[in-house]
C-alpha cells in the first residue's frame, strides 16, 4: 500500500510532505481524521490523528504533539453510551482519552496492527459510563508508579472482532455525519 492513499485518509494527509516528514519510511498511513482529545480537565480539544502500521500520531493542526507506538498499547476502554475511548499505554506519561464517531474503524485498524506485532488480540473493555475520565491514568499517577494503570480489571472484556462486526462481514459507517455511506470490508474476521 506504500505510495497509495488509504480509503480512510479522511484528511488527505498521505501526500502531505510536512506530515510525512514526521513518519518513518517503513510506516504506512492507514487512517487520518479529526478527533477530540480530552485534556486533564476533560475538555474536548480538536486534534488531527494519523494511524500507521506502527504508531498513532496526535497532531495539533499539523504540528506533532505525541507519537504513541503500537507496542506501548496494553488495552482500550470504550464507552457503551458515547464515542469515547481510552488508549491505555505502558512506558508513556499517561493514558490518552479520545472521542470519535469513527471509533470502530480506529479500533479495527489498531487491533489489526497490534495483532500483527504481538500475534495476540488487544484487550478491549466496554463500560456503561458515558465519560471515561475515571479510567484515564494521569501523569501524576505514572510519576508515582510507572506501572500504575486505571485500565479496568473487572469490566466486561470483549473480543474486539465480535464487538466490531458480530457475525457480519460488512458494516456501513456513516461518513461525516451525512448521507454518504462508506462500505467497510473486513478480512480475516474471527
Language-model region placement:
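A positional/structural detector of protein chain ends, strongest at the extreme C-terminus
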Residues: 1, 187-190
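Anionic N-terminal interaction surfaces
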Residues: 1-48
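Intrinsically disordered, low-complexity serine/threonine-rich segments
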Residues: 6, 147-149, 169-171, 178
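Intrinsically disordered, low-complexity regions of eukaryotic proteins
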Residues: 9-11, 35, 136, 164, ...
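Intrinsically disordered, low-complexity proline-rich segments enriched in Ser/Thr
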Residues: 13-16, 21, 47, 54, ...
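Phosphoinositide-binding peripheral membrane targeting modules
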Residues: 34-84, 88-104, 166
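Eukaryotic regulatory low-complexity N-terminal regions enriched in Ser/Thr, Pro, acidic
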Residues: 82-163
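Long eukaryotic intrinsically disordered, low-complexity acidic serine/threonine/proline-rich tail regions
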Residues: 170-188
Amino acid at each position: 500500500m506504500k505510495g497509495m492513499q488509504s480509503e480512510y485518509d479522511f484528511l488527505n494527509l498521505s501526500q502531505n510532505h510536512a506530515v510525512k516528514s514526521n513518519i518513518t519510511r517503513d510506516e504506512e498511513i492507514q487512517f487520518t481524521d479529526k478527533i477530540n482529545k480530552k485534556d486533564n480537565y476533560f475538555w474536548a480539544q480538536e486534534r488531527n490523528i494519523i494511524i500507521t502500521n506502527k504508531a498513532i500520531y496526535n497532531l495539533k493542526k499539523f504540528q506533532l504533539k505525541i507519537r504513541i507506538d503500537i507496542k506501548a498499547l496494553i488495552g482500550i476502554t470504550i464507552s457503551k453510551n458515547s464515542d469515547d475511548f481510552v488508549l491505555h499505554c505502558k512506558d508513556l506519561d499517561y493514558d490518552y482519552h479520545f472521542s470519535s464517531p469513527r471509533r470502530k474503524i480506529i479500533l479495527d485498524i489498531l487491533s489489526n496492527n497490534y495483532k500483527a506485532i504481538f500475534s495476540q488480540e488487544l484487550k478491549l473493555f466496554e463500560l456503561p459510563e458515558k465519560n471515561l475520565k475515571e479510567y484515564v491514568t494521569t501523569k501524576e499517577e505514572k510519576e508515582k508508579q510507572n506501572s500504575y494503570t486505571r485500565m479496568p480489571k473487572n469490566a466486561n472484556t470483549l473480543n474486539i472482532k465480535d464487538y466490531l462486526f458480530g457475525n457480519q462481514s460488512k458494516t456501513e459507517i456513516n461518513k461525516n455525519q451525512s448521507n454518504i455511506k462508506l462500505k467497510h470490508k473486513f478480512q480475516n474476521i474471527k
